[in-house]
């Protein structure tokens, strides 16, 4: 009998913002509060980096003073209460604090086990930008979608 250290089974494919393993994740609920700025592309879409404001709400990206606390989780339903493809200010959202998630790497291809970075103004995950501590690429995208990757994060 083979010993296993982790019984979380990886899923074969998914969409950005979906949890990629069926156990071993820490997810918390928060209220989203932000001002959408189209020039910054700070859409609160699944797989964006979020920060914790002093009032206990979260917002995509980072202002530089608040702690980054996780990755915005989405699922296969229409994400916003108002039927948009992104979350709106006032929506209750789930944030992955630790675990595995499918994400998009904007602006280039990912390298296996590379550090994950993000863009402060939008919260997009990238291979350049601000460093995300304890965030690594676990699986690189397939030929048909090279920007879709599996990420491991731990913001605890």
Residue ranges and their predicted role:
Residues 1-156:
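Surface-exposed, low-hydrophobicity beta-strand/loop segments enriched in small/polar/acidic residues
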């Amino acid at each position: 009998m083979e010993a296993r250290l982790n019984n979380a089974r990886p899923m074969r494919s998914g969409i950005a913002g979906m949890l990629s393993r069926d156990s071993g994740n820490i997810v918390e609920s928060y209220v989203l509060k932000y001002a959408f700025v189209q020039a910054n592309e700070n859409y609160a879409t699944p797989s964006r980096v979020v920060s914790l404001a002093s009032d206990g709400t979260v917002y995509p990206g980072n202002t530089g003073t608040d702690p980054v606390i996780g990755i915005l989780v989405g699922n296969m339903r229409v994400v916003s209460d108002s039927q948009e493809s992104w979350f709106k200010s006032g929506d209750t959202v789930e944030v992955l604090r630790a675990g595995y998630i499918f994400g998009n790497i904007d602006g280039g291809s990912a390298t296996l086990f590379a550090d994950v970075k993000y863009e402060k103004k939008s919260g997009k995950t990238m291979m350049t930008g601000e460093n995300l501590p304890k965030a690594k690429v676990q699986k690189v995208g397939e030929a048909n979608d090279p920007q879709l990757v599996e990420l491991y994060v731990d913001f605890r």
